[in-house]
């Protein structure tokens, strides 16, 4: 069984948990207390020099960065390739969505909310505009689409649903974006591990209360 170093409230950690559920892999979950500095202990830094979560250790093979872990789990354990198809064009669209999630959507969350939550900084209206722009892009991607990349659930949907659900608990109005809202409501029903994802979101919500 693979060791999984994580934090329940973390969106990237939740995307890995849902992906593992989708491919039927059980994770040996190891909770890290980042506020206590667990990630800086020498034994963890030896596993992951970047000392970040999530980190997976599968039979001695260590990997971090959630989207890399998602792809690894599907390629190694998926009974089919439906979550990350081998077709170059399908895979390219999934990769684009994953990079969009990492560099634009989730990044906009971090840039706007993290300074407020962790540094008690005032809200930055310019950073909020970046969130709105990211949701407009996602709304466009989802025009006429039930899924984020193609016609079935993929790792792109799983990564995006982890991010979008985090925006929901932060109080962002997802309903303003009709295509995103429709996709999100469906994703809640069809994404394996949604319940655990939502429990993690509620854990994270405490920072906003």
From Swiss-Prot:
The keyword Transferase applies. It comes from the Eukaryota. Its EC number is 2.5.1.18, 4.5.1.1. Keywords: Lyase, Transferase. It catalyses: RX + glutathione = an S-substituted glutathione + a halide anion + H(+); 1,1,1-trichloro-2,2-bis(4-chlorophenyl)ethane = 1,1-dichloro-2,2-bis(4-chlorophenyl)ethylene + chloride + H(+). Glutathione binds at residues 10, 51-53, 65-67. Residues 87-209 form the GST C-terminal domain. Residues 1-81 form the GST N-terminal domain. The keyword NAD does not apply. PROSITE patterns: GST_CTER, GST_NTER. Conjugation of reduced glutathione to a wide number of exogenous and endogenous hydrophobic electrophiles. Has DDT dehydrochlorinase activity. Homodimer. This is Glutathione S-transferase 1-1. It comes from Drosophila erecta (Fruit fly).
């Amino acid at each position: 069984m693979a060791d999984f170093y994580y934090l329940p409230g973390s969106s990237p950690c939740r995307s890995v948990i849902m992906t593992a559920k989708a491919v039927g892999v059980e994770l040996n979950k190891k909770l890290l207390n980042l506020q206590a500095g667990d990630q800086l202990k020498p034994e963890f830094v030896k596993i992951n020099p970047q000392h970040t979560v999530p980190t997976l250790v599968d039979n001695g093979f260590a990997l971090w960065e959630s989207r890399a872990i998602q792809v690894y789990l599907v390629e190694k354990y998926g009974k089919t390739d439906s979550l990350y198809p081998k077709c170059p064009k399908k895979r390219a669209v999934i990769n684009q969505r994953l990079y969009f999630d990492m560099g634009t959507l989730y990044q906009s969350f971090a840039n706007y909310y993290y300074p407020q939550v962790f540094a008690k900084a005032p809200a930055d209206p310019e950073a909020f505009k970046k969130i709105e722009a990211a949701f407009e892009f996602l709304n466009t991607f989802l025009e006429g689409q039930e899924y984020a990349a193609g016609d079935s659930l993929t790792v792109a949907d799983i990564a995006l649903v982890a991010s979008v659900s985090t925006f929901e608990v932060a109080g962002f109005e997802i309903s303003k974006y009709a295509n995103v809202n429709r996709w999100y409501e469906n994703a809640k029903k069809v994404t394996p591990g949604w319940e655990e994802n939502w429990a993690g979101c509620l854990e994270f919500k405490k920072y906003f209360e």
